[in-house]
Amino acid sequence: MAAPQLFRALVSAQWVAEALKAPRSSQPLKLLDASWYLPKLGRDARREFEERHIPGAAFFDIDRCSDHTSPYDHMLPNATHFADYAGSLGVSAATHVVIYDDSDQGLYSAPRVWWMFRAFGHHSVSLLDGGFRHWLNQNLPISSGKSHSEPAEFSAQLDPSFIKTHEDILENLDARRFQVVDARAAGRFQGTQPEPRDGIEPGHIPGSVNIPFTEFLTNEGLEKSPEEIKRLFKEKKVDLSKPLVATCGSGVTACHVVLGAFLCGKSDVPVYDGSWVEWYMRAQPEHIISEGRGKTQ
């Protein structure tokens, strides 16, 4: 295994399978299943993990590893909370973390956890290209049952440049210091299809650009090539040479925008963590752009 491979954003299923056969004590590999689904889908990610997962993987619960004092879903936890949680899963400073999920798309929620590790200073982290779907398609080994990780010491320090707040986005409406890319489906962005959360109407932040996260993926669920992703950004009139911020419904699929830019050589894209849910709940009606009901009060 060549060392540079360990720091790539994406690793292949075959690479992971080979790495599991030949573990390295100097840089242990830890697989994390970061599956997460919108509540209305009725899927239990942890139960599905216990039914089948990649051998040696642990389950990373995005909702558990979050700020439970926030009124918004799975906002980033503080550094101590993240360090304790990651350590409980067996992640140390020396660990190469590889993250995947079990979504039908290939990758859905895993890029959120990839972004979280980087935000807290752990850059030896990769995503399994194509996710568990691709692993299964390759007929690679699977396990079942609960995971049992040996706890490890892990320290974390949040890099604030990875996050944008509601105040940052509000100020940018006039200042226009950065572009905003929204990864939700087109109908939710336009205001013509419902949001999956009760009490939240669809629409978008003024001046934002829509690139649904699925547009970063091939039909097989693999990540598109950097050349294809650069072309996608260009088609959407997003300038990768200028500041860019990612948003979505609640900060999960926004991380596909971060990943796409990263693969194109732009590693400085932050996430608006509260995303559309926070924006809708806090914004004035004139700051909700929608072809639907919008916001009346």
Swiss-Prot record:
InterPro entries the record matches: Rhodanese-like_dom, Rhodanese-like_dom_sf, Thiosulphate_STrfase_CS, TST/MPST-like
Impact reported for residue 248 to S: Loss of redox potential. Abolishes bound persulfide and hydrogen sulfide production
Keyword terms: Acetylation, Cytoplasm, Disulfide bond, Mitochondrion, Phosphoprotein, Redox-active center, Repeat, Synapse, Synaptosome, Transferase
Positions of post-translational Phosphoserine modification: 35
Result of altering residue 188 to G: Abolishes hydrogen sulfide production. Slightly increased basal levels of bound persulfide
GO biological process: hydrogen sulfide biosynthetic process; kidney development; liver development; spinal cord development; transsulfuration
Lineage per the UniProt record: Eukaryota, Metazoa, Chordata, Craniata, Vertebrata
Domain description: Contains two rhodanese domains with different primary structures but with near identical secondary structure conformations suggesting a common evolutionary origin. Only the C-terminal rhodanese domain contains the catalytic cysteine residue.
Keyword match Cytoplasm: yes
One term of GO molecular function: identical protein binding
Effect recorded for residue 197 to G: Reduces hydrogen sulfide production by 50%. No change in basal levels of bound persulfide
Rhodanese domain mapped to chain residues: 25-144, 174-288
Described function: Transfer of a sulfur ion to cyanide or to other thiol compounds. Also has weak rhodanese activity. Detoxifies cyanide and is required for thiosulfate biosynthesis. Acts as an antioxidant. In combination with cysteine aminotransferase (CAT), contributes to the catabolism of cysteine and is an important producer of hydrogen sulfide in the brain, retina and vascular endothelial cells. Hydrogen sulfide H(2)S is an important synaptic modulator, signaling molecule, smooth muscle contractor and neuroprotectant. Its production by the 3MST/CAT pathway is regulated by calcium ions.
Activity regulation information from UniProt: By oxidative stress, and thioredoxin. Under oxidative stress conditions, the catalytic cysteine site is converted to a sulfenate which inhibits the MPST enzyme activity. Reduced thioredoxin cleaves an intersubunit disulfide bond to turn on the redox switch and reactivate the enzyme. Inhibited by different oxidants, hydrogen peroxide and tetrathionate.
Places the protein is found: Cytoplasm; Mitochondrion; Synapse, Synaptosome
EC number(s) per entry: 2.8.1.2
Modified residues (N-acetylalanine): 2
Top-rank taxon, per record: Eukaryota
Residues annotated as catalytic: 248 (cysteine persulfide intermediate)
Modification N6-acetyllysine occurs at: 40
PANTHER family referenced in this protein's UniProt entry, alphabetically: 3-MERCAPTOPYRUVATE SULFURTRANSFERASE, THIOSULFATE SULFERTANSFERASE
Top class in the EC scheme: transferase
Naturally occurring in which organism (per UniProt): Mus musculus
Binding site for substrate: 188
Region Hinge: start-end pairs: 145-160
Further comment found in the protein's record: Thioredoxin (Trx) or dihydrolipoic acid (DHLA) are required to release hydrogen sulfide from the persulfide intermediate.
Protein name per UniProt: 3-mercaptopyruvate sulfurtransferase
